[in-house]
Amino acid sequence: MKRKDNKELICIPSSSPPSTPIREENYYLLTSSPIECSPIQQLDLSGSFKNYSTTSSRANGKKFGQLAMQSRIFFDTTDHKKYVESSYAAYDPHDQPPERDVSLKESSNKINPSNFFDSEQITKINAVKKRFPALDSEMIIATLEKFNWRENITIHKLTFQKLLGRGNSTINKSAQKLNNQPIEKSSVDKENAKRKRYVEEGTKQGQKKKPLRVIELSDEETNEDDLLGQSPTACTTDANIDNSIPENSDKIEEVSIESSGPSEVEDEMSEYDVRVLNFLNESTLQEIVEVSGCESKVVEYFISKRPFPSLEKAEALCQRNAHAATGKRKKSDGRNVGRKLVNSTYEVLQGFDAVDSLIAKCERYGAMISNTMRSWHNLFDDKKMEQFLNTSTGSISYEYNSQQPSSIASGITLKSYQIVGLNWLCLMYKAKLSGILADEMGLGKTCQVISFLASLKEKGIQNRHLVVVPSSTLGNWLREFEKFCPSLRVESYSGTQSERINKRYYLMDTDFDVLVTTYQLASGSRDDRSFLRKQRFDISIFDEGHYLKNRMSERYKHLMNIPANFRLLITGTPLQNNLKELISLLAFMLPKVFDNNMQGLDIIYKIKTTSDGDIERAYLSQERISRAKTIMNPFILRRRKENVLSDLPPKIQHVEYCHMEETQLSLYLSVLELKNLVNANRENILMQLRKAALHQLLFRSQYNLETLSLMSKRILREDAYLDANPQYIFEDMEVMSDFELHKLADQYRHLHPFALKGKPWMDSAKVKKLCSLLKKSRPNERILIFSQFTQVLDILEYVLNTLDLEFLRLDGSTPVETRQQLIDDFHTNENYKVFLLSTKSGGFGINLTCANIVILFDCSFNPFDDMQAEDRAHRVGQTRPVHVYRLITKNTIEENIRRLANTKLTLESSLTTDSEKIQKEISGELMKSLQMDGRVDTMDGSVV
């Protein structure tokens, strides 16, 4: 646009700090190249302009950069000669005239940030520049300004753009512009809808209103600044000032708008702007609360005002009505509430897109694996094969081998499905990928892994391999190596600190094929971790791979630092229906694919769950969980017993209901009344109800305070308590159960008079049912008894001693070095009728096929824990039918737990091995049922 005098002007945005002087009589020369000089003498470290002088030196005139455009000065392109003469009049005539830069790129490279930014801002610029060296300085500065110099948010945004394939295109656009090359508009830009941005110019009291000056940019310039959805057509704050220079200097327009009210400026909504706006306009209350993390009251008010025509309208409503929504007074004006809702939603959506982008990288590898497995179709049924087929082209050259390795010990023959597993492992290794061997418990995963390592050695691959296992299975792995392939040279890395020091020196001078160690040592001390890293293993195998589900844990990070060419995870549990855990497993298996890209996923891990629900329940996450599982299929091999084992004996399930007697029932009802207390803790009440259904000795009802006072004084006569404080002892006794106090009295001579009379440990509904089952068992039958609680195992020891039955016990307190010996003793010595085990320690990774009866004394919240325990006996090598007995106390909370656990097993949306999550869900449902009716059925059918 031209003025009446035919002069063309370009006007620069003018929302500068209050200290910035405005000199409208000064004109700058504007050509197709950047401005040559600036009358601004210098810019202090705080970012404010100092008074300029026309007598400044030429050196100060060189202190010019892109940010000089932020000064509130007009440019007259027609009178530029007059301006040049006046601006150089005071310069030293002996100095050479300032050189003109011929390109924007050269000018931007000459910018010295120290002249325009303080030290903190310079540090942030360098941090972003180090992370994204391909971006030029002006792009980095503009992005930092957009996000108020928050470098973490800037890096996240740039990372997402890079992950989604937009970062490179943006950089290319910038490079094209710098070289004066034509720029093509992306398809996303063409599809973006126009939107209006309402901008308010804030003015302080007593401050003069400043004219708004707008630069009209060409399409090419709009594309260049479209990095993160930012539109450069209009901005009114320093953080959003456009720093680009119009290439067509003939089109210059002067616009003067007062800042007393909002102004409408045409802008384009970015891809994410449209998605966020649609999400906020269409999603439910719970979904917005889960994603944004805002309070329900704020979101309710927000929803009541929908739909919103723009994100700015949504932000403004939340900002202006935050107090009305919450009903609370705060020092701030509440503007951050609305900003948090929109920004949090924006970041979460980008986080999910980052997940999609990373998962997409796995599709190519999955296609190669599945296409190779087409030739194995005769080994799978059609339905199973469909899960592996992919329409993508490309495959891996691999010939299926139906023979087992010749180095496998004589007398051992791999089953057909194990041969398939061996070939799958070899295929993944040849493809330089990684995988998860997730066969159901008892199908011989250990045997398949050992055969895989033996096969590699026969092919001439003489490398070292690492096997990381839980402490309870270390001895079993060593025995399995010796049993299946004695030709493999296997070493164990375990023992005390001094023993491990000697072991490290020994291993440095020893040739071995496989090193077996535990999770505790592999992620423990610095010396152990350093030793394992220096070994440069070819293959790293991780038993019970679900231990690596948390990418943020120290264990995960330490194990990830152990270099390996191939990683294999072994697990017998189903994969978690949890986006974070699926991504963690993928990242651990394929670190090269995920390298330098995981930072963008941190937002997913920072999503806070609310009391109203869990982020994994939102549809946003569900569709990606489904896709992640589908893509992971080629990297996972999972078979079930009923599909591959025709000769495995059946597993027969029994549910034995136990009826409480009067004493136990009275105790249970008294605990049930606690739920009516105002300050009652939900989790504590549920635990107390479970204890009451198990055994009354788990409470303190027979030892009163007077008795405890006497016991605390008498115990001082014992040598172990000569110097003890009786008050402290009394306080400890107050929180002990009747059975713990009885054990204490039974242990120390001076407390014998306080021991319980008779055999009260036999007076429990479940104990009586257990005794009945033990008496019915045949002489040649061996029995495994599992319990969640070690104190229950203590009671069962007294029960078995009363029945005069020999038994063994293994729980979390059992030393690692003695666990395998206990298992061997149970296998070889038939005098041991019963093996007592804790569900957590004894339910994973051990082989107890010599037993054919499994008794679950109490059920776990997580049904998969119970299934693991059952399969200690029902696995390869079992020759007899396995009977599983679940003891359920009738008309108690145990029935509810069992019913809800069965529901979890049948619902695909709840296939998870996260015990804490399942316990939280079941606890909530149980408390709701208790609060609704507050009733309990007695043993005779009446209702209390």
Swiss-Prot record:
Broad class of the protein's primary localization: nucleus
GO molecular function, one term: DNA binding
A single GO cellular-component term on record: nucleus
Localisation per UniProt entry: Nucleus
Residues the record lists as binding ATP: D439, E440, M441, G442, L443, G444, K445, T446
GO biological process, one term: DNA double-strand break processing
Record-linked SMART domains: DEXDc, HELICc
Protein task: DNA helicase that possesses intrinsic ATP-dependent nucleosome-remodeling activity and is required for heterochromatin organization.
Family to which the UniProt record says this protein belongs: Belongs to the SNF2/RAD54 helicase family.
Name of the protein: ATP-dependent helicase fft1
Taxonomic lineage from the root: Eukaryota, Fungi, Dikarya, Ascomycota, Taphrinomycotina
Protein encoded by which gene: fft1
